[in-house]
């Protein structure tokens, strides 16, 4: 099948590359000339394990190509996938300007029957808005063309997106016509043949399913962080509690690790958007409000532990950070807990030395510029360079390379002996036996 994927960000690139790898012909469109020219040269603008190789392989065969011109890409397309951003508006609701702009442009240039698929995370009712936008453009042109609008949300985990797309636990397709259902069945036939479960439902149902899934994941994280806070005060080890509940098959072990809070491009904005959606129809989202509030509080936990040690005035203190990305396996800094921590440390007068194996390009763009210029915030190229003369080491992101550190290098480099573990990577007794003071989440 011939597809156009509009939006060459995280969702668009992963979806386009993987669909091309399954035998479809895909054109990825983006308004950024710099991004498209880079992709044509083989420069992938995001870090995702395996993505570079799959893009290169399919670009070489001609199955995957890139352009800034949507009208040019549309000429032979059967399916248009909208995969543009839906950032939060001031009230937390999803901003649909980019989605509807794409819909209008499709309506302006559509020449034959097609299927429009929303892969962007959008509120319930967005498909109707997309249809209205397309209809208005077709009416302005004085033409009638049959088309369908479907919802096909993605369920990709950053750092595992290729595996998630190629070996999905489910594929949700929201359709309101038999024609749309058949086209989506054809699109995903290669996946179904390999055992993927294709779930059909209405368009509005699919739109809601995406938000509900992310809200549930965020709820599990915030719930476990709340339990961790209680464990700290009662002298209980939250890791033992986690083991005790996660082995119950009704609960399972996914998204039950306490830590410094969740971030990324999905959970924070989707919880806000779902809560906003609820309020817009007169329904008070009490659980969602609590999930978001707990996460905001949890993001301050690392800084609060440092204040307990050094006091609120940290002038003359150097704090080393291991990890900046919101999770391992990605360079994504959106809503990362490290941002909250760095801003608080700088405000308290501390100097910060930070290392992350993948955020050399993304972190400097979102961290305070003035602090970088006056060297109060320094990004280093090695985890042991980060700890030089540090009064404390804070583990922010649980990259595998931090799991078994060289203790000799830590003792030699650090001025202090405090380790604050925001991801519970280490065993408290062992760290203390090695001569460090150790603080972790929900453990005494």
Regions found by a protein language model. Give the residues of each.
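Structural/interface elements that position substrates and couple domains in central-metabolism enzymes
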Residues: 1-444
């Amino acid at each position: 099948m011939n597809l156009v994927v509009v939006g060459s960000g995280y969702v668009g690139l992963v979806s386009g590359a993987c669909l091309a790898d399954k035998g479809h012909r895909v054109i990825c469109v983006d308004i950024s000339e710099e991004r498209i020219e880079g992709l044509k040269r083989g420069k992938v603008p995001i870090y995702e394990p395996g993505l570079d190789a799959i893009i290169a392989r399919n670009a070489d065969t001609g199955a995957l190509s890139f352009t800034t011109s949507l009208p040019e890409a549309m000429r032979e397309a059967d399916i248009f996938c909208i995969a543009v951003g839906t950032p939060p508006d001031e009230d937390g609701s999803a901003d649909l300007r980019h989605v509807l702009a794409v819909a209008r442009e499709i309506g302006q240039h559509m020449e034959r029957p097609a299927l429009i698929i929303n892969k962007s995370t959008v509120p319930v009712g967005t498909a109707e808005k997309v249809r209205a936008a397309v209809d208005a453009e077709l009416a302005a042109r004085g033409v009638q063309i049959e088309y369908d609008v479907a919802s096909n949300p993605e369920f990709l985990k950053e750092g595992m997106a290729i595996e998630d797309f190629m070996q999905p636990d489910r594929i949700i397709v929201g359709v309101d016509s038999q024609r749309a259902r058949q086209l989506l069945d054809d699109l995903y036939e290669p996946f179904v043949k390999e055992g993927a479960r294709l779930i059909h439902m209405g368009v509005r149902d699919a739109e809601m399913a995406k938000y509900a899934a992310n809200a549930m994941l965020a709820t599990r994280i915030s719930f476990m962080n709340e339990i961790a806070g209680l464990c700290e005060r009662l002298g209980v080890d939250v890791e033992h509690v986690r083991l005790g509940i996660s082995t119950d098959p009704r609960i399972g072990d996914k998204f039950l690790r306490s830590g410094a809070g969740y971030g990324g491009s999905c959970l924070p904005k989707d919880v806000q958007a779902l809560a906003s959606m609820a309020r817009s129809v007169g329904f008070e989202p009490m659980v969602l409000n609590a999930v978001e509030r707990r996460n905001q509080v949890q993001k301050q936990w690392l800084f609060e532990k440092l204040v307990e040690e050094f006091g609120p005035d940290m002038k003359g203190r150097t704090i080393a950070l291991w990890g900046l990305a919101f999770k391992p396996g990605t360079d994504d800094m959106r809503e990362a807990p490290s941002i909250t921590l760095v801003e608080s440390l700088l405000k308290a007068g501390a100097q910060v030395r930070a290392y992350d194996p993948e955020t050399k390009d993304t972190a400097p763009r979102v961290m305070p510029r003035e602090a970088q210029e006056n060297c109060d915030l320094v990004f280093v190229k090695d985890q042991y360079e980060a700890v030089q003369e540090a009064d404390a080491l804070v583990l922010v992101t649980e990259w595998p390379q931090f799991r078994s550190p060289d203790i000799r290098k830590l003792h030699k480099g650090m001025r202090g002996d405090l380790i604050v573990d925001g991801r519970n990577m280490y065993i408290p007794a062992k760290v203390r036996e090695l001569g460090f003071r150790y603080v972790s989440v929900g453990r005494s």
